[in-house]
Amino acid sequence: MNQNQDKGQGLLGRKVGMMRIFTDDGDSIPVTVLDVSNNRVTQIKTSEVDGYSAVQVAFGSRRASRVNKASAGHFAKAGVEAGTVLKEFRVAATAASELKVGDVIAASLFEVGQKVDVQGVTIGKGYAGVIKRYNFGSGRATHGNSRSHNVPGSIGMAQDPGRVFPGKRMTGHLGDVTRTTQNLEIARIDADRQLLLVKGAVPGAKNGQVIVSPAVKVKAKKGA
């Protein structure tokens, strides 16, 4: 495993969708396909200039006419195509020194079998009730219940305390929040098409943007 992985260097990507692959033993493994092509370095930050070491990466493609002047100048200075998203990855100074502006970081940054964390924006569900949002139980269908089948029930008490406590689970917007799924294993890497096949599901809809980084809570193998 190279030094960039140890210090948190990751990749930006796009969720292509889900499929399944088969092992040599014939076992079926559900995987999510992530497109991590064309991760280009736009800036190298150093402790001397910026106070910390980091690598800034751009992903995606955007027309120059759709980028504001500040971003256009930033991309032009780096000599790279304008991207849809920028992300910094904190790395060691020695790892940052191995890269230069304009470099493309490939999927080979990771290895098959490595554990990664994948961050994305979950699918928005709109305004939802407590049954869908928090898995509450429904009220009785009959026996005197005529209009309270899906209500949450009591949300407070009487004059004391005379208020609804913060954090009370009620109806509201569901989804469309940033979430991270941890310790997903890379099942396969397609170097030609710059694809990562990750075991299991990752947050977000198809074509959603994701951030793939080395797992921060890797569990030690038993007997290791």
UniProtKB/Swiss-Prot annotation:
The modification N5-methylglutamine is found at residue 159. Keywords: Methylation, Ribonucleoprotein, Ribosomal protein, RNA-binding, rRNA-binding. Belongs to the universal ribosomal protein uL3 family. Transmembrane segments: none annotated. One of the primary rRNA binding proteins, it binds directly near the 3'-end of the 23S rRNA, where it nucleates assembly of the 50S subunit. Methylated by PrmB. InterPro entries: Ribosomal_uL3, Ribosomal_uL3_bac/org-type, Ribosomal_uL3_CS, Transl_B-barrel_sf. This is Large ribosomal subunit protein uL3. GO terms for biological process: translation. GO terms for cellular component: cytosolic large ribosomal subunit. One of its GO terms (molecular function) is rRNA binding. It comes from the Bacteria. The gene is rplC. Part of the 50S ribosomal subunit. Forms a cluster with proteins L14 and L19.
